[in-house]
Amino acid sequence: MPTTFHEIPRKRPTTPLLDRAQTPDGLRRLGEAELETLADELRLELLYTVGQTGGHFGAGLGVIELTIALHYVFDTPDDRLVWDVGHQAYPHKILTGRREQMASLRQKDGLAAFPRRSESEYDTFGVGHSSTSISAALGMAIAARLQNSERKAIAVIGDGALTAGMAFEALNHAPEVDANMLVILNDNDMSISRNVGGLSNYLAKILSSRTYASMREGSKKVLSRLPGAWEIARRTEEYAKGMLVPGTLFEELGWNYIGPIDGHDLPTLIATLRNMRDLKGPQFLHVVTKKGKGFAPAEVDPIGYHAITKLEPLDAPAAAPKKAGGPKYSGVFGEWLCDMAAADPRLVGITPAMKEGSDLVAFSERFPLRYFDVAIAEQHAVTLAAGMACEGAKPVVAIYSTFLQRGYDQLIHDVAVQNLDVLFAIDRAGLVGEDGPTHAGSFDLSYLRCIPGMLVMTPSDENELRMMLSTGHLYNGPAAVRYPRGTGPNAPIDKSLEPIEIGKGVIRRQGRQVALLVFGVQLAEALQVAEKLDATVVDMRFVKPLDEALVREIASSHELLVTIEENAIMGGAGGAVSEYLARENILKPILHLGLPDAYVEHAKPAQMLAECGLDEAGIEASVRQRLALLGLA
């Protein structure tokens, strides 16, 4: 097994057992004694695959044995296996007939980064966001009962995803309907358990066995006839188990808790799953795994090896130096956050488990008492910020656009209705690339601009981002700044913390006939197009409040208005312009460019923008086509 990053195989390894186990049917034809070797081969294959394509890395390495055991014991796809989030699903894809397609992973027209129902019958539920698996599996279990089917429903959820309220809502509901389902907690952070070893594994086998289950149910029937006896016995059992296993919470919710067991011990996994397969009612199995298992660098640094980029062949020529680009937008935010926190002691930073991705590491180290990572709990993050704002704090919620969708009710009910001073720093706005539609920030302008009192800003470069963050921080009420993944155009940055005038756009180029009204980072492309068309370019900056005076001025002096945004056209910033013109009875041809009424599939960001007509060529072609239609070409 490779021990360094550079030892990851560039050529497909020899895997005789995996060659025979390319589907679950083939896997089940292997003997149990062969499965340990299969696990080694699958782990090596995963290293090779992700090295070829890039992608999620550590999570898959941690569930090799669990994935094998699940497909070995259960009759997938008839038994429904639901993976939470999907970061760990690459081994599942390899074992379910997609090994030869893995080279297309996360590429245009290739395999998706996450399980998708349209991709395979083994992908029973599409995922990408966390904490949905238990609810989905519960729905499947109830449907099976209504259909008089004996098929099983299994949810695999990580300890991080289990922190979300949605997961506990499902855990609370399943015992109420006595669902025949299995939840597997993949605990790869030791965040819940410490009792892992021989005793726990032994207990798991005993507690999950049919004999134990039969004795338990028989005792319940006998003792239920004696007043108070069953309750005493139940409490005695609970206390005895509680001394050895950490499952009291799940037992209290009504689950039959088994574990924790070693998630890399295949014989124990298989024996326990076989026992639990035929048990009725809600079953909960706690397995402990190590993220990055089998690859030392990933075991030591699971965060750094959560995902990797594509490896170049060892004999590849030296890559051409990359063009100098600007800093990452998230980095500009992180620096601003520290600067503003030093200047304003009221500032607090909140993130739902995105410290690294949103660049809050430096802030968390410099201002630990003002930094709050609430885990995967977007609803809580928003209302926590609201509560802080009620007491005079100035919260900044750093959150990805796609995840803010999960806290939308709180955004309206708890923040906006009360006009509280909460700034939302919305990262990953627009198209994000290889992770596909589940992670795209396609809708934030649409769902934000309809909220009364909301300040909504779209920077065109790094400097505007910094200025808009200051503007939102000083604003009396809820504010949002949305910015994309990746780097800016290397604009000079004003390090001051001064705001800009609210609701005012800026004309960046004066032209004639055509006016390009840009909301966000497509400004650079618009300026290039404008040089060819002699068009006016307006950096609109604010979606709400819209610079209506500037729109009126531009409409009066141009024959065609073109709005450009990396957001859904429906309900987006362009719609705000059209609504204003209609309200003022201003008749003017207008073309809206943005994201279509469709989910843009995974590809490289440049490919996705081209597909949507938001690259330079696409913008130019659309404008020329409309000019021709209007007889203005």
Swiss-Prot record:
PROSITE patterns: TRANSKETOLASE_2 (PS00802). Pfam families: DXP_synthase_N (PF13292), Transket_pyr (PF02779), Transketolase_C (PF02780). Mg(2+) binds at D159, N188. Pathway: Metabolic intermediate biosynthesis; 1-deoxy-D-xylulose 5-phosphate biosynthesis; 1-deoxy-D-xylulose 5-phosphate from D-glyceraldehyde 3-phosphate and pyruvate: step 1/1. The keyword Nucleotidyltransferase does not apply. One of its GO terms (molecular function) is thiamine pyrophosphate binding. InterPro entries: Dxylulose-5-P_synthase (IPR005477), THDP-binding (IPR029061), Transketo_C/PFOR_II (IPR009014), Transketolase-like_Pyr-bd (IPR005475), Transketolase_BS (IPR020826), Transketolase_C (IPR033248). Keywords: Isoprene biosynthesis, Magnesium, Metal-binding, Thiamine biosynthesis, Thiamine pyrophosphate, Transferase. It catalyses: D-glyceraldehyde 3-phosphate + pyruvate + H(+) = 1-deoxy-D-xylulose 5-phosphate + CO2. GO terms for biological process: 1-deoxy-D-xylulose 5-phosphate biosynthetic process; isopentenyl diphosphate biosynthetic process, methylerythritol 4-phosphate pathway; terpenoid biosynthetic process; thiamine biosynthetic process. One of its GO terms (cellular component) is cytosol. Residues 1-22 are annotated as: Disordered. Thiamine diphosphate binds at H87, G128, H129, S130, G160, A161, N188, F295, E378. Homodimer. Catalyzes the acyloin condensation reaction between C atoms 2 and 3 of pyruvate and glyceraldehyde 3-phosphate to yield 1-deoxy-D-xylulose-5-phosphate (DXP). This is 1-deoxy-D-xylulose-5-phosphate synthase. It comes from Pseudomonas fluorescens (strain ATCC BAA-477 / NRRL B-23932 / Pf-5).
